[in-house]
Curated annotation (Swiss-Prot):
The keyword Amino-acid biosynthesis applies. One of its GO terms (biological process) is L-tryptophan biosynthetic process. It holds the Pfam family IGPS. Its EC number is 4.1.1.48. The keyword Lyase applies. CDD domains: IGPS. Pathway: Amino-acid biosynthesis; L-tryptophan biosynthesis; L-tryptophan from chorismate: step 4/5. This is Indole-3-glycerol phosphate synthase. PANTHER family: INDOLE-3-GLYCEROL-PHOSPHATE SYNTHASE, TRYPTOPHAN BIOSYNTHESIS PROTEIN. InterPro entries: Aldolase_TIM, Indole-3-glycerol_P_synth, Indole-3-glycerol_P_synth_dom, Indole-3-GlycerolPSynthase_CS, RibuloseP-bd_barrel. It catalyses: 1-(2-carboxyphenylamino)-1-deoxy-D-ribulose 5-phosphate + H(+) = (1S,2R)-1-C-(indol-3-yl)glycerol 3-phosphate + CO2 + H2O. Keywords: Amino-acid biosynthesis, Aromatic amino acid biosynthesis, Decarboxylase, Lyase, Tryptophan biosynthesis.
Amino acid sequence: MILEKIVETTKDRINQEKRRLPEEVIKKSATEMAIKQGFGSSSSISRDKFFFEEVMSRPGVNFLCEIKRASPSKGMIAKDFDPVFIAKEYEEGGAAAISVLTEPTFFLGKDDYLMEVKKEVGIPVLRKDFILEAYQIYQAKLLGADCVLLIVSILTEEQLTGFLKICDELGLSALVETHNQEEVMRALQCGARIIGVNNRNLSTFEVSIENSLKLRTLVPKEAIFIAESGISTPEQIKELKEAGVNGVLIGETLMKASNKKLMIRNLKSLL
């Protein structure tokens, strides 16, 4: 299973990074940054304080546009790769937020890509990686991320609950990714405020937009619902809007487009 390989590789990467920069050091720096920004363990949770949540809860279908160089299912997606240029195209095209892959082995991502993008855009940035430890959440804060991805299928309920608490204390939103009914219910029980439904099965990599349409009814209206993967036409986005979806994560369709601004506008044409 490719997901299991990614998880094992990520564990090794975290251990190497911890040897270079111990967790107590990175935790202290991230916590101090959050306190300066008005967050911390005693701060109250208000959606408008969290940049990513405020943006993705706006009326209509909000576009979370992804920057990724490669993927296990498609191989190399973008040989000529300039993440800052792509991010600016996304922002000018009407993206609400940007997702940046930082996983280096299977997606050829880099932490530097996120830092560079964050400096150049005025919209929220999501760190998309395979988060297995709190260490990576502290990293995300220091990289400048506004949001992190938490994948239900690779975390225990105890981990997910704990990571959501850390995110709140750091002023980070958490997009909690699910794929089926059981995972959606687990995410909600753990306190997730943003539910993502991946239309791609991470075990088989098969894609079906019906997954988002089917699971939308399980998520309360006060939570943010984001449909992820396999979205490539204005008709699909119109259908998702009618189902009450708040946002869509679009990656490969945009990464392969020669004119990304035009592609975003085309995808929005039926809204």
